[in-house]
């Protein structure tokens, strides 16, 4: 269930993402009904999430704390020291919350740096009962703003776990982006590096949000991927900027995106628009962080590389493509 706390779709998406799993905690129901509807800025979200995260950590509720630390970091720029502090706290409390599980962290060598990866081993009982032909490994890919912790926690909702689950922060994602490795279009390369590291010869792959595009790109060029789930599927990354716009403005936005020149005009226009929209402001901030580029016109040109048009017809694996009627992206 999606709750409209504030009326701001971007804010409500992040608040639902964090608070839905912890609504049963003492006092959270009051916060959900009395405090969240009054939220009007990213600064308020950061302060509220930090206070709650620190409170729950002191109370020993690491499962609530890691989710709130992630939200506290969400809207902060990469140059804000609080972001790194909150992400470190998220990882620390996530590990505490999942202590005792067959879940391990890994650093996968890649292009002179490292990809953060996590592996959750299959449940032996589920594995023994799995039908013949069940994949032995599931690789899960996050998207535009996720971390390995969040995406692998998603697997806790699976009714059974007859396969190893591997997730990783690729270039431009989560911990890997924070370490300075920018987003790259050839997603098969980091995927192959992760499969090599774990000695995986075949795997199913699932992508969430922008990961729904990345998993398709990886499948098109990585034959070790045998089955694909896109949850949901994004044909091109730039749709994330244009789809939320009023329908009448989308053709204009598409025209600007396809030819982001003159650059100074585009930079000035998007800079002005972002001051009027918290959603656009955050998207541009996050895009700069992931790509390592500074100007909006540069970001638009770089995002143009993330489209399925270039590899149409190359995906031959069985695919399950999911989409929601009210999806934002």
Task: Pin down the residues of each PLM region.
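Alpha/beta-hydrolase active-site loop
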Residues: 150, 157, 179-200, 204-205, ...
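Short beta-strand element of the alpha/beta-hydrolase
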Residues: 129-143
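Flexible "cap/lid" loop of the alpha/beta hydrolase fold
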Residues: 229-256
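Active-site nucleophile elbow and catalytic-triad environment of alpha/beta-hydrolase enzymes
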Residues: 293-311, 317
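Conserved alpha/beta-hydrolase
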Residues: 158-175
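N-terminal cap/lid segment of alpha/beta-hydrolase-fold proteins
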Residues: 42, 49, 80, 84-130
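Short beta-strand/loop motif that positions the catalytic acidic residue
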Residues: 315-316, 321-323, 327
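Short glycine-enriched nucleophile-adjacent loop
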Residues: 205-207, 212-223, 228-235
């Amino acid at each position: 269930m999606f709750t409209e706390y504030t009326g701001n779709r971007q804010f409500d998406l992040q608040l639902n993402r964090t608070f839905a799993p912890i609504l049963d905690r003492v006092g959270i129901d009051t916060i959900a009904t009395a405090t969240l509807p009054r939220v009007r800025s990213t600064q308020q979200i950061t302060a509220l999430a930090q206070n709650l995260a620190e409170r729950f950590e002191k109370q020993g509720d690491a499962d609530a704390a890691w989710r709130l630390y992630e939200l506290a970091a969400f809207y902060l720029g990469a140059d804000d020291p609080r972001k790194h502090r909150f992400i470190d706290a998220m990882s620390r409390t996530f590990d505490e919350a999942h202590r005792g599980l067959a879940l391990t962290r890994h650093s996968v060598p890649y292009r002179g740096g490292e990809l953060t990866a996590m592996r959750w081993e299959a449940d032996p009982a589920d594995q023994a009962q799995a039908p013949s032909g069940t994949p032995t490994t599931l690789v899960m890919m996050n998207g535009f703003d996720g971390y390995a912790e969040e995406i692998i926690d998603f697997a806790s909702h699976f009714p059974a776990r007859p396969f190893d689950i591997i997730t990783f922060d690729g270039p431009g994602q989560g911990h890997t982006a924070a370490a300075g490795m920018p987003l790259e279009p050839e997603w098969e390369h980091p995927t192959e590096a992760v499969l090599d590291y774990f000695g995986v010869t075949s795997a199913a792959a699932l992508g969430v949000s922008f990961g729904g595009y990345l998993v398709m790109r990886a499948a098109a060029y990585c034959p070790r991927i045998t089955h694909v789930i896109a949850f949901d599927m994004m044909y091109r990354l730039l749709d994330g900027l244009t789809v939320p716009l009023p329908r009448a403005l989308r053709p204009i936005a598409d025209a600007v995106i396809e030819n982001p020149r003159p650059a100074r005009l585009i930079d000035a226009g998007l800079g002005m628009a972002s001051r009027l929209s918290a959603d656009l402001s955050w998207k541009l901030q996050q895009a700069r962080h992931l790509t390592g580029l500074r100007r909006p016109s540069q970001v638009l040109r770089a995002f143009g590389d993330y489209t399925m048009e270039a590899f149409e017809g190359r995906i031959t694996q069985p695919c399950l493509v999911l989409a929601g009627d009210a999806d934002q992206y």
